[in-house]
């Protein structure tokens, strides 16, 4: 499971 906010960080 991947989350978008982790990429933006």
UniProtKB/Swiss-Prot annotation:
Record key words, sorted: Bacterial flagellum, Periplasm
GO cellular component: periplasmic flagellum
Keyword Ribosomal protein: no
Superkingdom of this protein's organism: Bacteria
Location relative to the cell: Periplasmic flagellum; Periplasm
UniProt keyword annotation of Nucleotidyltransferase present: no
Function text: Component of the outer layer of the flagella.
Subunit relationships: The flagellum consists of an outer layer composed of two sheath proteins, flaA1 (44 kDa) and flaA2 (35 kDa) around a core that contains three proteins flaB1 (37 kDa), flaB2 (34 kDa) and flaB3 (32 kDa).
Name of protein: Flagellar filament outer layer protein flaA2
Origin species: Brachyspira hyodysenteriae
